[in-house]
A protein has these predicted regions:
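Glycine-rich phosphate-binding loops of nucleotide-dependent enzymes
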Residues: 2-252
Length: 252
């Protein structure tokens, strides 16, 4: 593995007597796609919420770029270089694709913004939005209201909004949800490209996509880690086959 930029040790989150995430330890390196897979209710989204600071852990630790980040809130986690997308598309539908990305870029400005100064006056913000759209291949769609874009393009816009905040670590929660084969292939190609300059932690149910793009996998069941390893190790793991992959294949 290259330089480890995101690492958890024994990360745990209780809701009352339920351990939604229980003792999860994993590491993600720069230039790596680390996929977290598992059946519904395994704790995958709760794990991402812990990593993004949207939820505080009940126990365990988290490091970002070698420094302790345990229990930090989402704003501080974001400023440390972490961006996330959500399971459900989280965009401003009436606004254009460019305006969505510009809003995201504004959220990372360290200088104060004058209330009566138009957003268009901030060149660095507009440039960040344009770069983000170009990174996801939608530079020609910037002037279109997001409501008029396809579902796949809306998911790309959400990733572009994440990129507009200039993260080094991407937490992506089911970016291929609800997509057809052509749209999925486009997102997989995008993830491959982004992995060259980012660490990506990916939660996804599309196993074809996962095995096409992941460098490492963690399998979760009932909040705990069942197995971790390279794709070929996970694919041949009998416990994983019985608990998850076998059920996935039977359902197809």
């Amino acid at each position: 593995m290259s330089e480890v930029v995101l690492e958890t040790t024994g990360l745990t989150r209780h809701f009352g007597g339920l351990a939604a995430v229980n003792g999860v330890s994993l590491a993600c390196g720069m230039g790596e796609v680390h996929a977290v897979i598992g059946p519904n209710g395994a704790g995958k989204t709760t794990l991402i919420n812990l990593l993004s600071g949207d939820l505080p852990p009940s126990d365990g630790t988290m490091k970002l770029f070698g420094s302790d980040a345990t229990g930090l809130g989402p704003e501080r986690i974001s400023r440390l270089g972490v961006g996330r997308s959500y399971q459900k598309t989280n965009v401003f539908l009436p606004f254009t694709a460019f305006e969505n990305c510009r809003l995201a870029a504004q959220s990372r400005m360290r200088t104060s913004m004058r209330f009566f100064r138009p957003a268009t006056a901030y060149r660095e913000v507009s440039e960040a939005a344009e770069r983000a759209l170009a990174e996801v291949g939608l530079e020609d769609r910037g002037g279109i209201p997001v409501a008029a874009l396809s579902h796949g393009e809306q998911r790309q816009i959400e990733i572009a909004m994440t990129l507009a905040t200039r993260p080094k670590v991407l937490l992506l929660d089911e970016p291929l949800a609800g997509m057809g084969a052509e749209e999925s292939a486009r997102i997989v190609a995008l993830l491959r490209k982004l992995s060259r300059s980012h660490a990506i932690l990916l939660v996804e149910h599309d196993m074809d996509a996962v095995f096409a793009v992941a460098d490492a996998l963690t399998v979760m069941v009932n909040g705990t880690v069942l197995a971790s390893g390279r794709p070929e190790e996970i694919r041949s793991n009998r416990a994983v086959q019985e608990a998850y992959l076998g059920a996935e294949e039977a359902a197809q």
